[in-house]
Amino acid sequence: MPRSLKKGPFIDLHLLNKVEKALEAGEKKPIKTWSRRSMIIPDMIGLTIAVHNGRQHVPVYVTDEMIGHKLGEFAPTRTYRGHAADKKAKKR
């Protein structure tokens, strides 16, 4: 269920402060964050945000189509390697 419109988007305060500092300084260095729950806002367009996936920080370049989505949606946490192959079928 989506968040109520009267509440507005959620973004962690420490991440918002980092975004504002990067915009003022004009830095292109990735912003490291562990806040996967924060929503992408229009101020983040053009920035690279390194989102933690539990093991490493995944760089996410923010575009205008991403506004309204959460940062965690763009940093997958699970790696799928496929099911094990059937050994009987390989021998034939």
From Swiss-Prot:
PROSITE patterns: RIBOSOMAL_S19. Keywords: Ribonucleoprotein, Ribosomal protein, RNA-binding, rRNA-binding. One of its GO terms (molecular function) is structural constituent of ribosome. GO terms for biological process: ribosomal small subunit assembly; translation. GO terms for cellular component: cytoplasm; small ribosomal subunit. InterPro entries: Ribosomal_uS19 (IPR002222), Ribosomal_uS19_bac-type (IPR005732), Ribosomal_uS19_CS (IPR020934), Ribosomal_uS19_SF (IPR023575). It holds the Pfam family Ribosomal_S19. Disulfide bonds: none annotated. Signal peptide: none annotated. Belongs to the universal ribosomal protein uS19 family. NCBIfam families: rpsS_bact. Protein S19 forms a complex with S13 that binds strongly to the 16S ribosomal RNA. This is Small ribosomal subunit protein uS19. It comes from Idiomarina loihiensis (strain ATCC BAA-735 / DSM 15497 / L2-TR).
